[in-house]
Design a protein with these regions (language model features):
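Acidic/His- and Gly-rich active-site-bordering loop/insert found
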Residues: 1-97, 101-128, 133
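Conserved active-site and cofactor/substrate-binding residues in soluble primary-metabolism enzymes
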Residues: 10-13, 30, 34, 38, ...
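Residue-level signal for inorganic ion chemistry
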Residues: 22, 161, 269
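Active-site beta-loop-alpha junctions enriched in small/polar residues
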Residues: 27, 76-78, 134-136, 179, ...
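Metal-dependent amide/peptide-bond hydrolase catalytic core
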Residues: 45, 226-347
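Glycine-rich beta-alpha junction loops
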Residues: 77, 178-180, 206, 253, ...
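Histidine/acidic-residue-rich, glycine-tolerant segments that coordinate divalent metal ions
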Residues: 85-95, 101, 117-248, 255-260, ...
Length: 347
């Protein structure tokens, strides 16, 4: 173990430099071509073979050559759209506001340290490193096009890797994630759970008419959408606190011209919850609100559902093992345990 720590200290500056480079050059999911290239350069320098998988993903293996369990290390490296972020890309406002660049540096450093310390000579089994693309559930039209073109089969990178069977050999998967904790003394968190979610693409279809001369001849799809939002907001008091429900949305198309009654309005939304049943129960309420609003305004309605991520529950034995190692670096008072986050992830 001491040799691994020594190698980590030696590798750390290069790993941090790589992570900072990726931070300053963010790419959205299934577009991480440059980020992958930087990781590949680091693996080549260490003489570790790798395989490109899942469109923009990457996989590498340290093999002891002896029968034994396989441990997987997972790192994400996609960014998320953040308008106004100081390091946002000029083309798509992509920024590493979720900290995936840090995962890249951390897991690469661990993998290289295991290799350089010669750990596999004293172990059985394998250690696999996965750079998984497209964790952030965004830029969905682009991803749907990739699916239509047959380049991927699923909207997220880990879903894609699961479908390809890339995790099948692994007995255990380890990952890490930066957390934007504010006003806290905690420096680490273990055993946290997360909400799951489903994604909806909603289209209200009305009838165009001149908004000044003949508005009575039109059917205003924008009114249907605003009515639906009001209905969803009125439902919020029916969401049980213990279900940790979140329903949030954006308008992706709000009309074609001010001079016309809006005939097509599009919105996307997430429904998040602590359990699958909580998500399904809330989804039924939201769908009823959407249908009721469309019916009230006499609009047609289209709802396209995309499976998101399951709620996250971590393995208790593995969590305790990780916690015991964190205690080597900080006191117990700095470790948060068993919290629930209402965000989501695809681990």
């Amino acid at each position: 173990m001491q040799k691994v720590h020594e190698e980590l200290e030696r590798i750390l500056p290069k790993a941090i430099a790589l992570a900072e480079d990726i931070f300053k050059n963010p790419e959205l999911g299934y577009k991480e071509f440059r980020s992958r290239e930087k990781v590949e350069e680091a693996l080549k320098d260490a003489e570790i073979p790798f395989t490109e998988v899942a469109y923009t993903g990457l996989m590498a293996t340290l093999d002891s050559g002896k029968e034994g369990p396989c441990i997987g290390l997972i790192a994400e490296f996609d960014a998320v759209p953040v308008l106004g972020h100081p390091y946002a890309s000029s083309d798509q406002n992509a920024a590493h506001a979720c900290g995936h660049y840090a995962q890249t540096g951390v897991m690469l450093a661990v993998f290289l340290a295991l290799k350089e310390a010669g750990v596999m000579e004293r172990l059985t089994g394998k250690v696999k490193l996965f750079f998984t693309p497209a964790e952030e559930f965004c830029d969905m039209d682009y991803r749907r096009n990739l699916i239509r073109e047959g380049k991927v089969s699923h909207s997220s990178g880990k879903q894609e890797m699961i479908s390809l069977g890339l995790f099948d050999e692994c007995a255990v998967l380890l990952s890490c994630h930066s957390m934007g904790l504010i006003d806290t003394d905690y420096q680490a968190e273990v055993g946290a759970s997360l909400n799951g979610f489903c994604q909806k693409k909603v289209t209200f279809l009305g009838t165009e008419a001149h908004a000044g001369a003949n508005p009575h001849l039109g059917v205003n799809a924008l009114h249907a959408m605003t009515l639906a939002i009001s209905a969803i907001n009125a439902l919020r008091e029916s969401f049980p606190e213990e279900d940790c429900i979140r329903v949030h949305y954006i308008v992706t198309e709000g009309g074609q011209t001010v001079n016309s009654v809006p005939s097509r309005i599009k919105m996307e939304m997430y429904i998040r919850g602590k359990t699958v049943e909580a998500i399904r129960s809330t989804e039924r309420k939201v769908d009823r609100a959407l249908r009721g609003a469309a019916l009230a305004i006499n609009c047609d309605l289209e709802i396209q559902n995309t499976p998101g991520y399951f709620p996250l529950e971590q393995d208790s034995a593995l969590t305790e093992l990780v916690r015991s190692q964190i205690l080597r670096y900080m006191p117990e008072s700095r470790i948060a345990e068993g919290t629930h986050g209402t965000a989501s992830g695809d681990m």
